[in-house]
Amino acid sequence: MSDQRRKSAGRRKYTPRRKVCVFTAEGIVPDYKDIKRLQRMVSDRGKILPRRRTGTCAKYQRKLNVAIKRARHLALLPFVSENTRG
């Protein structure tokens, strides 16, 4: 009897919620001038976050990469964070 309780009282399996592409849902295109939105797609070290982490679809991930690189080139977004600078 106690064995059955232990098995049923085990941990529940974690099922991650499916991430929805923000750009598709809101109907917008990634723009290099939208710094707030671009900063959410960049890690604290300054790296571009992957699709599996942000939930963006392939089409908008490619456009997002171009927008982030363009914003970096125009000095709207830093290449690295303040913490990693020497």
From Swiss-Prot:
Keywords: Ribonucleoprotein, Ribosomal protein, RNA-binding, rRNA-binding. One of its GO terms (cellular component) is cytosolic small ribosomal subunit. The keyword Ribosomal protein applies. GO terms for molecular function: small ribosomal subunit rRNA binding; structural constituent of ribosome. GO terms for biological process: translation. Coiled coil: none annotated. Pfam families: Ribosomal_S18. PANTHER family: 30S RIBOSOMAL PROTEIN S18, SMALL RIBOSOMAL SUBUNIT PROTEIN BS18M. HAMAP family: Ribosomal_bS18 (MF_00270). Binds as a heterodimer with protein bS6 to the central domain of the 16S rRNA, where it helps stabilize the platform of the 30S subunit. Belongs to the bacterial ribosomal protein bS18 family. Part of the 30S ribosomal subunit. Forms a tight heterodimer with protein bS6. This is Small ribosomal subunit protein bS18.
